[in-house]
Regions:
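Acidic, polar-rich low-complexity tracts and alpha-helical solenoid repeat scaffolds
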Residues: 2-5, 23-288
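Sec-dependent signal peptide recognition
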Residues: 6-13
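Enrichment for repetitive, rod-forming helical segments
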Residues: 15-16, 91
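A periodicity- and composition-biased signal for non-globular, repetitive helical segments
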Residues: 14-15, 128
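C-terminal motif of bacterial Sec signal peptides marking the signal peptidase cleavage site
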Residues: 18-22
Length: 288
């Protein structure tokens, strides 16, 4: 392209952005200048013009307006290549606006309509993020966390070679850790109120189902506390033995060691039960 051609293209794009700048949410705009003022419907524009307007709104940090224009392309030019491109941008724009239900809906439509497209992996990743980005604190309802885990797992399994797989794996681990944190929070609540059996049930879930998370050492220590409080020394010693075998350098093991030795006990496997089974798995390298 010649220099004159490049300038002409730049002028044309600038004019299109200015022309669309006055577009309102009722799909019309007002023109002025040497012409009489008139309303021009959005339908009068080509899809690439509307698409550029959407990009313009994104650059202005107005994702809600951007999503509107991208959605209009899907409405006005369905089944076109511009509709395909606009749909993934619509999902992205809604996500930027923290409109997670609409982002998820747009991403799911993209996956349904274009399952083999290069952007399908990104659509699935956006769908997962629509759940994941709402996980903000341990005390929140865990339904979103389960949905995030499911969507992230699908991203990893369906698109293992995509550029989003690694990020999905990291977020999956964090969401998994979040669920374990919820169990720990409830377990501590019961432990403080001396509801030892209820507390043990929560800590057991962490040890059995979330053993790869960062909460496992504390869960084992809390089991030592709870079992000692109930006078169940065999289980307390076995929990301490598992803790010492896997996390000997942690303060949780040091605290458990002090508790056990303070009662003349040692952190060693004693008896059978569920902790005894885990200890045997630990020795064989089958646990954690």
């Amino acid at each position: 392209m010649t220099r004159i051609g490049s300038v002409q293209k730049a002028i044309l794009i600038g004019c299109m952005c200015c022309a669309l700048a006055a577009c309102s949410r009722d799909s019309t705009r007002t023109t002025g200048g040497i012409f009489n003022q008139q309303e021009v419907p959005l339908e009068a524009y080509q899809p690439e013009q509307i698409y550029e307007r959407g990009e313009f709104e994104l650059n202005r940090n107005r994702p809600d307006d951007a999503a509107f224009y991208f959605a209009e392309i899907e409405r006005l030019y369905p089944y076109s290549d511009w509709a395909r491109r606009a749909l993934i941008m619509q999902a992205f724009s809604y996500h930027q606006d923290q409109d997670y239900p609409n982002s998820r809906s747009a991403a799911q439509r993209f996956i349904d309509f274009y399952p083999d497209d290069d952007d399908a992996a990104y659509a699935q990743y956006l769908l997962a993020l629509s759940y994941y980005d709402q996980i903000d604190e341990v005390g929140r309802d865990q339904g979103l966390t389960f949905q995030a885990l499911q969507a992230l797992r699908e991203t990893i399994e369906r698109y293992p070679d995509s550029e989003y797989a690694r990020s999905a794996i990291l977020k999956f681990d964090l969401a998994f850790d979040h669920l374990a944190g919820k169990e720990m929070e409830i377990g501590r609540y019961y432990l403080r109120r001396e509801h030892y059996t209820a507390a043990i049930n929560r800590f057991r879930v962490v040890v059995e189902d979330f053993q790869t998370t960062s909460h496992t050492p504390e869960a084992l220590h809390r089991l030592v506390e709870a079992y000692l409080s109930l006078g169940l020394t065999d289980q307390a010693q076995t929990a301490g033995a598992i803790l010492g075998f896997n996390y000997q350098s942690t303060t949780w093991y040091q605290d458990s060691f002090v508790l056990l030795t303070g009662q003349g006990l040692r952190p060693e496997p004693t008896g059978d039960g569920w902790l005894g089974q885990i200890y045997r798995q630990t020795i064989k390298g089958e646990w954690i």
